[in-house]
Amino acid sequence: MDVLVVGGTGFIGQHLCRELDDQGHAVTALSRSPADATLPDGVETVAGDVTEYDSIESAFEGQDAVYFLVALSPLFKPDGGDGMHERIHLGGTENSVQAAEEHGVDRFVQLSALGADPDGDTHYIRAKGRAEQVVTQSSLDWTIFRPSVVFGEGGEFVSFTKRLKGMFAPGVPLYPLPGGGKRTKFQPIWVGDLVPMLVDSIESENHVGETYEIGGPEVLTLRDVTNQVYDAEGSSVSVVPLPMPLAKVGLSVLGSVGFPMGADQYRSLKFDNSPATNDIDMFGVSSSSLTTLSGYLRG
């Protein structure tokens, strides 16, 4: 199949392009900065900005399937402010769906997020929810994935965890966690486990019109994640529990003066980022076969 990966030079995108190429598909990766990626020689790259329809439209010509992977991180306030979530997630999806419909693309796969909701608590979740509506109301044969946090080579989940160490007291191994890190939950999935499911979704008609919530083999609190990250490298940190009301005020104030986290990041800390029902079985995958975060960290 001829496959276009919108956001193909990002973390998940590069892994997906490699897997698609390995499976014999003709792959094109579209991104704003295609030269920054390390992709197989067989993967074509094209430059385009999803917020500008005319810059991406021609890339959809002749494609059998399209993946939309472009996303801003919910872990930080985006450059340009929270309104960028609407511009990128919603606007980018609208432009991509329009181009796919214009060129008769057969399959459209949207990478969304757990909790996506047009009326959600954060700009990120609302934009993701509205983007899903654009996809489901289109004429395309679509599939939507809502993964929990994804980890692996090139990802930011583990590096973000490390960045918090000493953030408020450089050089001191203190780790401030709102609520002691016990309230925030994830079900992390390794990118190497997620990508084959993404590929399978365009190779079987069984996945058309389906929305899948995807998680890894275990539910972890933010404190669990923190401990695993530092245990794996043989170091330790002292967790400093921050009362949730204090974290709310602190992040709101810091966000207003340019700190890369703000009110939305506080709201995200209260969100259970694990799927209600893990749909990995729809791809013939069992939980016991998946890579744990600790297993990945220890190599």
What does each of the following model-derived ranges do?
Residues 15, 19, 80, 99, ...:
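Rossmann-fold NAD(P)-dependent oxidoreductase module
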Residues 29-37:
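Short, polar loop motifs at secondary-structure junctions
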Residues 3-23:
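N-terminal Rossmann NAD(P)H-binding glycine-rich loop of SDR-like oxidoreductase domains
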Residues 245-299:
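A hydrophobic C-terminal alpha-helical subdomain
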Residues 13-14, 90, 129:
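Residues forming the Rossmann-fold NAD(P)(H) cofactor-binding site
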Residues 118-231:
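Oxidoreductase cofactor-interface core, primarily capturing Rossmann-like NAD(P)-dependent enzymes
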